[in-house]
């Protein structure tokens, strides 16, 4: 494990970068600022290492990043309608962004300096204390995020937390993948399989789900067999028009509820790199990077629309306000414990 400086935050605190490697030539780097996944170096079919996630060279880029490159999102990922929810008869008001609450508002966990609990050659654990009322959520919530790089070429992200009151917790990682390399431009020729026969249609461009679980069959939302991301992204289909391309929740076909199972397979023919994604959560948000704001990232590379895609494990967005959905409620004294894995084949 290598530790080095990653720049200084706006309030004068030093951020650190931790680099892990395995026996097969893979490397990942993570930072204590926002518990971001900064880089994932994977050997391609010719043995050349490619960095397959978008990001920045120092903490400065992450402080102003609105796309959440590589971010640990908390307490709640995705959207809560009207930036409010009710729990045990009490209404909790959250900060509004985009007229709802997206990724827990402007003061997300990805804009904070985390503590490092432990670090070794294969894993780093970051810890954050989120006080009662933080972002509008109830309860003192202590959470850890552990990044592990295995010799099976898997990046494991394990979340563990507890709270002294019942609260909402729905954390995720917002990495943008480009299996040709972060500097390779469009991801539309890369292929995807999603283990999901249903998706969550949205009401309008604000991307709040209707509450319906709609079949993907016969629609451009069908990724049950391998398909290029760009094959139907511009189709004359209302759901894609509302969100400028894919940015939808998919309900995973789970064999056993709560078990870690395959959720997606993405591949790039040009690099020869394949990524398998696994989670124990019920859903995944597939986002094709439709609204990546033009920005200069790592090594001076210019990022733009659809230069990376996200596979964000989660509960159904706005489930806390939806009848009939599994709600992301962590009860006082219980342990929040979930794992998402991105495994690379090369």
Model-derived features with residue positions:
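An exposed, glycine/acidic-rich loop-and-rim segment of catalytic or binding clefts
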Residues: 1-346
């Amino acid at each position: 494990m290598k530790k080095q400086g990653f720049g200084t935050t706006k309030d004068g605190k030093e951020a650190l970068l931790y680099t892990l490697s395995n026996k097969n030539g893979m490397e990942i780097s993570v930072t204590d600022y926002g518990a971001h996944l900064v880089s994932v170096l994977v050997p391609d079919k010719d043995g050349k290492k490619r960095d397959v996630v978008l990001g920045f060279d120092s903490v400065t880029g992450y402080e102003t990043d609105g796309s959440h490159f590589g971010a640990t999102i908390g307490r709640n990922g995705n959207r809560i309608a009207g930036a409010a929810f009710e729990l045990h008869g009490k209404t909790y008001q959250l900060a509004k962004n985009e007229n709802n609450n997206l990724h827990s508002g402007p003061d997300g966990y990805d804009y904070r300096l985390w503590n490092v609990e432990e670090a070794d050659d294969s894993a780093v654990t970051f810890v954050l204390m989120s006080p009662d009322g933080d972002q509008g959520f109830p309860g003192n919530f202590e959470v850890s995020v552990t990044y592990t790089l295995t010799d099976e070429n898997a990046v494991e992200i394990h979340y563990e937390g507890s709270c002294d009151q019942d609260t909402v917790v729905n954390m995720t990682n917002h990495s943008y993948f480009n299996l040709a390399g972060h500097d390779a431009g469009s991801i539309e020729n890369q292929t995807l399989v999603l283990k999901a026969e249903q998706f969550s249609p949205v009401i309008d461009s604000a991307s709040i789900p209707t509450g319906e679980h709609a079949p993907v069959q016969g629609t451009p939302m069908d990724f049950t067999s391998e398909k290029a991301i760009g094959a139907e992204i511009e189709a004359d289909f209302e759901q894609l028009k509302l969100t400028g391309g894919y940015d939808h929740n998919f309900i995973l076909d789970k064999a056993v509820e709560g078990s870690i199972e395959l959720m997606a397979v993405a591949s790039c023919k040009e690099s020869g790199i394949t990524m398998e994604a696994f989670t124990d959560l019920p859903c995944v948000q597939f986002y094709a990077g439709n609204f990546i704001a033009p920005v200069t990232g790592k090594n001076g590379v210019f990022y733009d629309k659809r230069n990376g895609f996200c596979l964000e494990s989660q509960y159904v967005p706005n489930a806390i306000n939806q009848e009939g959905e599994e709600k992301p409620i962590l009860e006082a004294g219980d342990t929040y414990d979930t794992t998402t894995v991105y495994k690379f084949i090369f």
